[in-house]
Amino acid sequence: MRGLLGSSWKKFGHAGRGTYEWLTSEPGLPLLETQLQGTQGVSSTQEDVEPFLCILLPATILLFLAFLLLFLYRRCKSPPPQGQVFSIDLPEHPPAGEVTDLLPGLAWSSEDFPYSPLPPEATLPSQCLPPSYEEATRNPPGEEAQGCSPSV
């Protein structure tokens, strides 16, 4: 190995060149390899941008449009709110001496309130209060209490 390192290129010649100008002269044109690397540098940036423009950007746009359409679909198909809104038309100047009763004029009987937990014939004080302490202690544990129980 020392023999190879100690040997000089002068022993073997200048590899077929007629003069030694190539040692002292400045380089003229870049080598073919460096020219190819330069074009690869330009094409590599184009190769970096191409997957973004062809794959990632359209996929992102389609995903955004899908979420937008899903949001609009759910918004249009959402059920109406559960509360019932009604309006009362009151006269601006009621006749003098006449007492107007507003509640009988409302159409309570025509509408059932589906969100009410009470049965239609139940009133709050009569059926849905818990039994008194005396009634609860008098009844045996096996009997049904007379309080508010869901009707099936």
UniProtKB/Swiss-Prot annotation:
Q: What is its main location?
A: membrane
| One GO cellular component, as annotated | membrane
Query: Which domain of life does the protein's organism represent?
Result: Eukaryota
Region Disordered: start-end pairs: 117-152
Localisation per UniProt entry: Membrane
> Where are the bilayer-spanning segments?
52-72
Keyword list, A-Z: Membrane, Transmembrane, Transmembrane helix
Q: How does it sit in the membrane?
A: Single-pass membrane protein
Designated name of the protein: Small integral membrane protein 28
This chain's source organism reads Homo sapiens (Human)
